[in-house]
Amino acid sequence: MSAKNNIQDQLLNTARKEKIDLTIYLLNGVPLKGKVVSFDNFTIILENENKQNLVYKHAISTIIPAKPIKLHSEETPKEAGGV
């Protein structure tokens, strides 16, 4: 999958650049709130009240932004190779 089609990276990068608050739910149900400081292939650094959390992506269930995030290249299912 090319970088422009990587929805995960697009969402996290837009949230970081626009300083959008996120609620990240872990697999055990614990919610973490904050802004994305940085991320890589395996982790996200989330900051809230001047405290940083290093969150491993494999522990994440759901990411909910405080407002809708427009992805750069939203495609219709047909354009994406769907039916």
Curated annotation (Swiss-Prot):
GO terms for molecular function: RNA binding. It holds the Pfam family Hfq. CDD domains: Hfq. It comes from the Bacteria. The keyword Nucleotide-binding does not apply. Signal peptide: none annotated. Residues 9-69 form the Sm domain. RNA chaperone that binds small regulatory RNA (sRNAs) and mRNAs to facilitate mRNA translational regulation in response to envelope stress, environmental stress and changes in metabolite concentrations. Also binds with high specificity to tRNAs. SUPFAM superfamilies: Sm-like ribonucleoproteins. Keywords: RNA-binding, Stress response. Belongs to the Hfq family. NCBIfam families: Hfq (TIGR02383), PRK00395.1 (NF001602). GO terms for cellular component: cytosol. Homohexamer. The keyword RNA-binding applies. This is RNA-binding protein Hfq. InterPro entries: Hfq (IPR005001), LSM_dom_sf (IPR010920), Sm (IPR047575). It comes from Leptospira biflexa serovar Patoc (strain Patoc 1 / ATCC 23582 / Paris). PROSITE patterns: SM. GO terms for biological process: regulation of DNA-templated transcription; regulation of RNA stability; regulation of translation, ncRNA-mediated.
